[in-house]
């Protein structure tokens, strides 16, 4: 297999377990480990995760330099907010290539990935070029090797005037939330078993699962009892149910929950124990709301503040770039993510967690959740200059008008204790403590 490219790129180095290979001028060849180590050390080379590549070759993780063109950084810049496993194979999968197996195939795939991503920048419309152009001059000054290649294809008129400031002031381009009139009291209509199983059938068809699943239908029917109107004030209906792995519990309770929310004009809170289960419920919600824009409004994930990007922390780190105490490239890639993220969740959302580990960057300079979320309870709320664009505040307000809110037990309990919220919260609890374990 050969590759033709009109971009002036260095050769691509792949070092999976079992061998090393280099793709140069469209053809790949095997390398010994010493040869690969020398090429990596001398550069320039294309790599996927410079830190891991160095460790496989027995070298120290390098500082960011023009010798190492990390295609993962290019991916984070061109396709912000999209998931990618941090390997050549991961890049190949997300870009639609055949998954490479050998080191030769991975080196070719890495070169193809860089070429495809750069070709996407050449096809951007003016709006996309302007959004990226705010950051590219600053990235070029910081020594990011892809910056000059991308800028070469940009008309000078598409580089915004504020690009000279580095473009890291991403808070200035975020939309603000607006207060809306409070909702009235929720309705009290119940959900019938027929409504729940009908909704379940719709969701299974959307998920491509057309076979009969009587156990899952029975679970969905049982869950409807949690939505019966209260007979006595402050005594909600409670259903304690258990089902084995593979039954399909998530869609089993999302089906009646979504019907209840639609009929009664109020959100249903689904509480779970772990972030992994929150992600799973959110993923399966794709069958409930296939359209991403509708899903963003109808299904909201709620977590504690320590999970979300704090714009004030980000601003403080961005100001450190001029002093040389912050990672300019990492912050620029984070700025791209801020413009594309669904909800600003850095710990389990769409933030590429591998960004801080690609190169040797001091911990206090990294664009990482450790530095960019509020872990010390120092939020000043309405006194913050970014209060109107705050991701947490947007999530709070979005949850009020959603149909399904996916939260964790800690947030739900604190929410109930301090705000006395009265909403229906079904939980998937295989033990009396209400904890979810799988």
Name each region found by the language model:
Residues 224-228, 250-264, 284-288:
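Walker A/P-loop NTP-binding motif
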Residues 62-79, 270-275, 294-311, 429-438:
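Conserved beta-strand -> loop -> alpha-helix junction used to position metal-binding or nucleic-acid-contacting
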Residues 241-253:
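Glycine-rich P-loop/Walker A and Walker A-like loops and their local beta1-loop-alpha1 context
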Residues 9-121:
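Conserved DEDDh/DEDDy metal-dependent 3′-5′ exonuclease domain
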Residues 190-201, 267, 272-403:
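A substrate-engagement module of RecA-like helicase motors
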């Amino acid at each position: 297999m050969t590759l033709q490219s009109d971009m002036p790129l260095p050769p691509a180095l792949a070092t999976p377990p079992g061998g090393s290979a280099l793709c140069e001028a469209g053809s790949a060849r095997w390398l010994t480990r010493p040869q690969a180590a020398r090429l990596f050390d001398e550069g320039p080379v294309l790599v996927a995760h410079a830190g891991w590549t160095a460790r496989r070759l027995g070298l120290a993780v390098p500082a960011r330099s023009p010798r190492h063109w990390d295609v993962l950084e290019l991916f984070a810049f061109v396709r912000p907010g999209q998931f990618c496993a941090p390997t050549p194979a991961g890049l190949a999968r997300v870009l639609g290539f055949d998954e490479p197996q050998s080191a030769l195939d991975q080196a070719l795939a890495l070169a193809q990935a860089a070429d495809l991503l750069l070709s996407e920048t050449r096809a951007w419309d003016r709006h996309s070029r302007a959004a990226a152009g705010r950051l590219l001059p600053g990235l070029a000054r910081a020594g990011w090797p892809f910056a000059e290649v991308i800028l070469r294809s940009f008309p000078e008129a598409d580089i915004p005037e504020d690009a000279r400031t580095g473009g890291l002031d991403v808070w200035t381009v975020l939309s603000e939330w607006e207060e809306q009139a409070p909702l009235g009291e929720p309705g009290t209509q119940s959900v019938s078993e027929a409504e729940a199983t009908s909704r379940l059938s719709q969701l299974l068809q959307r998920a491509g699962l057309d076979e009969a699943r009587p156990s899952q239908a029975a679970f969905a029917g049982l869950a409807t009892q949690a939505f019966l109107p209260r007979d006595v004030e402050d005594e909600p209906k409670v259903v304690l149910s258990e089902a084995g792995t593979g039954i399909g519990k998530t869609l089993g309770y999302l089906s009646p929950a979504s019907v209840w929310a639609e009929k009664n004009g109020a959100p249903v809170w689904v509480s779970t124990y772990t972030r992994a289960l929150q992600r799973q419920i959110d993923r399966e919600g794709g069958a409930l709301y296939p359209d991403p824009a509708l899903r963003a409004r109808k299904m909201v994930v709620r977590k504690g503040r320590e999970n979300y990007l704090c714009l004030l922390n980000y601003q403080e780190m961005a100001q450190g770039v001029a002093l040389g105490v912050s990672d300019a490239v990492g912050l620029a890639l984070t700025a791209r993510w801020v413009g594309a993220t669904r909800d600003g969740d850095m710990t389990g959302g769409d933030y590429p967690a591998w960004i801080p580990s690609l190169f040797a960057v001091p911990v206090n300079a990294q664009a990482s959740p450790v530095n960019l979320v509020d872990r010390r309870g120092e939020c000043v709320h309405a006194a913050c200059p970014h209060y109107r664009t705050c991701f947490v505040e947007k999530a709070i307000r979005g949850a009020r008008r959603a149909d399904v809110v996916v939260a964790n037990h800690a947030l739900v309990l604190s929410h109930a204790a301090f705000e006395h919220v009265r909403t229906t919260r079904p939980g998937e609890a295989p033990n009396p403590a209400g904890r979810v374990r799988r």
